Amino acid sequence: MLKKLEVLEDTYKDLSEKIGDPDVINDQKVWQKYIKEHADLEPIVMKYREYKSVLDSIKESKEILQEESDEELRELAKMELAEMEEKVAPLEEEIKILLLPKDPNDDKNVIVEIRGGAGGDEAALFAGDLFRMYSRYAERRRWKIELLSASDTGVGGYKEVSFMIKGKGAYSRLKYESGVHRVQRIPSTESGGRIHTSTSTVAVLPEVEDVEVEINPNDLRIDVFRSSGNGGQSVNTTDSAVRVTHIPTGEVVSCQDGKSQLKNKEQALKILKARLYDKALAEQHKDIAAERKSQVGTGDRSERIRTYNFPQGRISDHRINLTLYKLDAFLDGDIDEMIDALITVDQTEKMTAI
């Protein structure tokens, strides 16, 4: 590990010189590339330097204890040695985590698709609750939200809703949300007070660039139709809604919330590219899953990942057996505690697999 860290530090020093070179600065494309590489290496190099400083302090304290006869100095050296030795193991763990292969999608924006599943109107209402939860979470992290497509029920819920969250590290934190979310609560229409169970499915897709997914225009069928509101009521007198079908895979995306046909087509293609990219990722994850059993990070859409129990005010994540009793705050976007726990388990699994 130390040899690898030395190489990374040398690379970091080299990049530090390059980004200050006037000739490199003049070539903005190359300069931006070096700036990103430098920024990516900085956390691990800073942590390595802190680790080296701690090891140096330990060495100095041991030398004092071997050579010094003054009791006061020896006592200070003992205290320093104990303090520094306590830091070694935690620093080594932090360095191991920083050395883990980085998910190339982690810094990307995300497209989130939520669909009401089993449970009719209750499932649609829960899909609306999840949409609000992720919207509030994005606000807490000062990320931007852009609605891409929505099919509402007219009673406060969604059959399905797609939206983009833009912000640094959005995918790194939200990628663990893909799967089936289950809700247990008493519907307002339930006179007998019985608890009903409903589900909604969440898909979190990294936004992709055109260079990452190429779509042959001949593989697309594009239909235009009139936008409609609740119950089929027309909300637009022009054929501005767009349905894009990817013929080879059968993927269908409809968008009608944009102000123009062009905008709806752009949104639909954006979602389609993200879905196709996500399918390719899923195939890769299958290969990885065959090598190691993973609790989190598989992103399997059919996997029941979490239960929201309203009578008990609890949220239980079934992948890591974590239960929190703060349902109201959680649905208001206070979900970092759960996400941090999922990240920790994921990192631990990856370290074990190395």
Swiss-Prot record:
Disulfide bonds: none annotated. The keyword Protein biosynthesis applies. SMART domains: PCRF. The modification N5-methylglutamine is found at residue 233. InterPro entries: PCRF (IPR005139), Pep_chain_release_fac_I (IPR000352), Pep_chain_release_fac_I_sf (IPR045853), Prokaryotic/Mito_RF (IPR050057), RF-1 (IPR004373). Its main location: cytoplasm. Keywords: Cytoplasm, Methylation, Protein biosynthesis. GO terms for cellular component: cytoplasm. SUPFAM superfamilies: Release factor. The keyword Cytoplasm applies. Belongs to the prokaryotic/mitochondrial release factor family. Peptide chain release factor 1 directs the termination of translation in response to the peptide chain termination codons UAG and UAA. This is Peptide chain release factor 1. It comes from Clostridioides difficile (strain 630).
